[in-house]
Amino acid sequence: MSAEETASDSTSAEIIEIVGKTGMHGEAMQVKCRIREGSNQGRIITRNVLGPVREGDVLQLRETQRDADSIGGQ
């Protein structure tokens, strides 16, 4: 996949809150992010992210329809 394909297929989203760690060993972070463009602009969704992130970072999402399950599990 080239950089041009990635740019046209993805949607940017800004991290507004870090909810907590998730995954079997705490390797992923669950974050709330606001969609910045496209048909879902302004919508806030929950996603699981690998790697170091902090509030204000911008993610490139391939899909904006799915939300991550909540961490609580109860």
Swiss-Prot record:
Q: Which GO terms describe its biological process?
A: maturation of SSU-rRNA; ribosomal small subunit assembly; translation
GO MF annotations, alphabetized: structural constituent of ribosome
Source domain of life is Archaea
Q: Which UniProt keywords apply?
A: Ribonucleoprotein, Ribosomal protein
Among InterPro entries, the record links this protein to: NA-bd_OB-fold (IPR012340), Ribosomal_eS28 (IPR000289)
Keyword Ribosomal protein assigned: yes
Q: Which residues form the signal peptide?
A: none
A single cellular component GO annotation: cytosolic small ribosomal subunit
Write one Pfam family the protein is assigned to: Ribosomal_S28e
Family according to the record: Belongs to the eukaryotic ribosomal protein eS28 family.
- What's the name of the protein? Small ribosomal subunit protein eS28
Task: State the organism named in the record.
Answer: Haloquadratum walsbyi (strain DSM 16790 / HBSQ001)
Lineage at the top is: Archaea, Methanobacteriati, Methanobacteriota, Stenosarchaea group, Halobacteria
Q: Which gene encodes it?
A: rps28e
